[in-house]
A protein has these predicted regions:
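Flavin-dependent oxidoreductase catalytic cores
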Residues: 1-144
């Protein structure tokens, strides 16, 4: 059965992909799931510099589920391009990079640095409330 789909001009072999923020860049799950079966891997947020994320505790159980506030922890774009992109390119899947930042110039910096990286798409993260700026989503701040 043909399960191909086209997303923003990029053909995926199927519509199954990870969601940003939950799958790292796939290395952590390589032994549990066959990444070659995914249409795409959507990475955790990648910033222009390493981000430590929020202090612990980051996860709590609540009635009916769990809440997390990781805070966009990540290695930064340089480490991502050297370590994660080559790992992902070993697999037959598209790479969608979630780009995050604290300012417009942060986003531009990451996008420009990724221009020569072998990635298929970019996803712009403008809605993560788990950052120190008072919890306001970047996309809701009129100053941005």
């Amino acid at each position: 059965m043909n399960t191909k789909v086209t997303l923003a001009g990029v053909e995926l072999k199927n519509p199954v992909m990870t969601c940003s923020g939950t799958f790292g860049s796939g290395m952590e799950y390589g032994e549990m799931i066959d990444l070659d079966r995914l249409g795409a891997v959507v990475t955790k947020g990648i910033a222009n510099v390493p981000w430590p994320g929020n202090p612990t505790p980051r996860v709590t159980e609540v009635y009916g589920g769990m809440l997390n506030a990781i805070g966009l922890q990540g290695p930064g774009v340089d480490v991502f391009m050297k370590r994660d992109v080559p790992f992902l390119r070993q697999h037959d899947t598209k790479i969608i990079v979630n780009v995050c930042g604290k300012s417009e110039s942060d986003y531009v910096d990451v996008v420009e640095r990724l221009a020569d990286a072998d990635v298929d798409m970019l996803e712009i993260n403008i809605s993560c409330p788990n950052v120190k700026e008072g919890g306001i989503a970047f996309g809701q701040d009129p100053k941005c």
